[in-house]
Amino acid sequence: MRENCTDYRDLFINDRPMMDARAPVEFHKGAFPGVINLPLMNDIERQKVGTCYKQHGQQAAIELGHQLVSGRTKAERIEAWASFAKANPDGYLYCFRGGLRSQIVQQWLKSEAGIDYPRVIGGYKAMRGFLLETTEQAVAECDFVLVGGMTGTGKTEVLAQLHNAVDLEAHANHRGSSFGKRASGQPAQIDFENALAIDLLKRRAAGQRQFVLEDEARLIGRCSLPLPLYQGMQHYPLVWLEDSLGDRVERILQAYVVELCAEFVAVEGAEAGFAAFAARLRESLANITRRLGGERYQRLAAIMDQALEEQARDGQVDTHRGWIEALLVEYYDPMYVFQRESKAGRIEFAGEQQAVVEYLRQRSGHFPEAPAS
């Protein structure tokens, strides 16, 4: 039998398969990428055992647990664990603290299915603590540089061209602005933090010590940046990305209208998807009514409504440019002008996309290989 595991670094760097024996309610509050939830007890069973533990103590709770998970229920769960173990012979199982629940799963697999399967010592809690420390260590030991710039300048496009970029918005599944919600929703806060930590861990294991991030607010949608990282971002050097208003409008049109509509249609179908997309766009504008002011909001909402009607009728998106350009010029740009002035002392380079990409590659000492002739 393989040994029980305490090497959390190996688990995450090598994407070891893991099954989580916690109840679904625990799993959905926070888990690790790619892990499968195969609980010892469901939510109701866990609640009953927890109440029994508080009222009558550990032994009574253990006895109740064995009563609740018995017969056909027990056999079905053992079958699910055995299927996972056979499909993932290099995997592990865990519960919250690596204690009784994972030990019981381990024992039942052995006695009922003849399978020796190792567990993670310390369980979810220890692995979660390891990942929190991973992020703190990266912030303390690595070099970070931020990419800033007005809305629509293509900061995400810059990140996509860099080997050492960490895309925070991709981890949060959100574009980072008032209009940034995606059709597929955001991860739980803990899932966001765990995935980011694993990303940093893998990159550091590959030898990276310098990272490029987009200059973000503390909140990306409803995902909050880890505090040590956010605090560091208030001091990191900044590269400022520039582009023309026309190019920015086109980029916003593509991302927030064409691509977002396609996302909703892919998830919900043509008719329901377009309706959900239109509702999301209107909701995003309504959410900043107070900051826009009533008159400006009404003007932009009227243009947006006309644009959505035309898009629904014949697929044309040209009219969307009207509210997009007005929103940039009248709302977003003044905020970014203030931000740039307040961060001027940290800006070490400014330019358009290709110049910024080349500067950041030079800064990291990394250049893409030339294509073979």
Curated annotation (Swiss-Prot):
InterPro entries membership: Rhodanese-like_dom, Rhodanese-like_dom_sf, SelU
Catalytic reaction list: 5-methylaminomethyl-2-thiouridine(34) in tRNA + selenophosphate + (2E)-geranyl diphosphate + H2O + H(+) = 5-methylaminomethyl-2-selenouridine(34) in tRNA + (2E)-thiogeraniol + phosphate + diphosphate; 5-methylaminomethyl-2-thiouridine(34) in tRNA + (2E)-geranyl diphosphate = 5-methylaminomethyl-S-(2E)-geranyl-thiouridine(34) in tRNA + diphosphate; 5-methylaminomethyl-S-(2E)-geranyl-thiouridine(34) in tRNA + selenophosphate + H(+) = 5-methylaminomethyl-2-(Se-phospho)selenouridine(34) in tRNA + (2E)-thiogeraniol; 5-methylaminomethyl-2-(Se-phospho)selenouridine(34) in tRNA + H2O = 5-methylaminomethyl-2-selenouridine(34) in tRNA + phosphate
Keyword Transferase: yes
GO molecular function: transferase activity, transferring alkyl or aryl (other than methyl) groups; tRNA 2-selenouridine synthase activity
Keywords: Selenium, Transferase
The Rhodanese domain, residue ranges: 12-136
Gene Ontology BP annotations: tRNA wobble uridine modification
Stated role: Involved in the post-transcriptional modification of the uridine at the wobble position (U34) of tRNA(Lys), tRNA(Glu) and tRNA(Gln). Catalyzes the conversion of 2-thiouridine (S2U-RNA) to 2-selenouridine (Se2U-RNA). Acts in a two-step process involving geranylation of 2-thiouridine (S2U) to S-geranyl-2-thiouridine (geS2U) and subsequent selenation of the latter derivative to 2-selenouridine (Se2U) in the tRNA chain.
Subunit and partners: Monomer.
Entry protein name: tRNA 2-selenouridine synthase
Gene transcribed to yield this protein: selU
